[in-house]
Amino acid sequence: MVATVNPEAASGITIGYSVGSVADWLRRITVCIRGARGSRGSGVIWRPGLVVTNAHVASGNVNSLEFFDGRKAQGRLLARDTDIDLAAIEIDARDVATAAVRSARELRAGEMVIAIGNPWDGEGALSAGILHRAAGTQPVIFADIRLAPGNSGGPLADARGNVIGINSAIFRGLGCAIASDEVTKFLSRSGVMEAA
């Protein structure tokens, strides 16, 4: 059985998608972030001009970013919180797709989840799994999904392509992501973006 999905994209176009097409969409909103020492991670284009990633990925005031289509840009660090492992980066790129975000509070255990990131040399690599337990109001989402270091900062999404969290770590074999609601709080608290 092939799941059909219907992400409400920034373009406003509504089309049914296969899981593969959802992955293609997620690649469009995911950037590769390269560190000064050759490290690499991922980030999510949260809105035009703004990328969200992990604090441990955003290693300096200026970060080198690469988009899915090969374009490159320099990013400027706007905010960083090592306690919750989130960072916000400003980019000078307005003609880009942006994430459709879903509250993690709506999630149910067993839902299919998809991660996109840049592990090893696999730019835009796909991993899929299921939600380990309902997130509720918890700040972290746990999923039975295979993540690698380059997935850090990239999107964890539902089967419709909605971003539900930012991939952050691996704990006892489970993928861990910071819930989208925590990202919203971080952006509001740091003055980057008003609370929705």
Model-derived features: positions:
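A conserved glycine-rich beta-strand in the N-terminal activation segment of trypsin-fold
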Residues: 14-20, 29-48, 54, 71-74, ...
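Active-site substrate-binding loop(s) of clan PA
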Residues: 21-22, 66, 76-78, 90-123, ...
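Short, conserved beta-turn/loop elements at beta-strand boundaries and strand-helix junctions
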Residues: 38, 48, 59, 80-84, ...
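Active-site region of chymotrypsin-like
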Residues: 26-32, 87-101, 122-196
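N-terminal targeting leaders that route proteins to membranes or the secretory/organellar pathways
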Residues: 1-24, 163, 186-196
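Short, well-ordered loop/turn sites that connect or cap secondary structure elements
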Residues: 46, 58-59, 107, 157
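Short, surface-exposed secondary-structure boundary micro-motifs
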Residues: 36, 54-56, 118-119, 168-169
